[in-house]
Design a protein with these regions (language model features):
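Conserved nucleotide- and phosphate/pyrophosphate-binding catalytic cores
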Residues: 1-136
Length: 136
C-alpha cells in the first residue's frame, strides 16, 4: 500500500502556511472557472475545490460559479486559501490550547467517567432485575 500524501488533505491543526501551500499544489486544469455545474462534469478536481469553497463560505455551488465565472484557478485558490485559513486556523488554535490545558482535560475526563458510571449502574440494575439477579 502506498503512503498517503500529506498534501491530499487539510488537517485541523495545519498552519496558515501549510493550508496555503496545500491549496496552491491542489490539482486543477488550465481552463477558467465555468458558469454552470454541467460544465464541471468532466472536471472533478475543479468541482472539488469549488465545492469546498462554497461550503466554507456557506454558499451554494451555483452562487460560487456565478461569482467566480471566468476567473483563473490560480487567483481562485487565493480566495479559497483565505476562506480556509479564516475557518480552520481558529479551530487549530483552540485544539492546541485544549491539549495544553491538562487540568481542564482531566476535569472533563473525570466528569465523563462519573456520568458513564452513573448510566452504566442504572443499566446494570435493569439487566439484573430482568434476569432475576435482584434480591428483594
Amino acid at each position: 500500500k502506498s503512503e498517503e500524501s500529506n498534501y491530499s488533505r487539510i488537517n485541523l491543526q495545519d498552519s496558515e502556511d501549510e493550508i496555503r501551500k496545500k491549496i496552491k499544489k491542489a490539482k486543477t486544469d488550465s481552463s477558467p472557472i465555468p458558469g454552470t455545474i454541467e460544465e464541471l462534469k468532466d472536471r472533478p478536481e475543479a468541482l472539488n475545490l469549488l465545492s469546498i469553497y462554497s461550503f466554507v463560505i456557506s454558499s451554494t455551488i451555483e452562487k460560487t460559479l456565478n461569482t467566480m465565472k471566468g476567473r483563473e484557478f490560480s487567483k481562485f485558490k487565493n480566495d479559497l486559501s483565505d476562506a480556509l485559513v479564516a475557518t480552520i486556523c481558529p479551530i487549530g488554535k483552540k485544539i492546541k490550547n485544549l491539549k495544553n490545558d491538562q487540568s481542564y482535560l482531566l476535569k472533563i475526563l473525570h466528569e465523563g467517567t462519573e456520568k458513564a458510571n452513573s448510566i452504566a449502574e442504572k443499566n446494570l440494575d435493569k439487566v439484573k432485575e430482568i434476569v432475576g439477579f435482584v434480591l428483594h
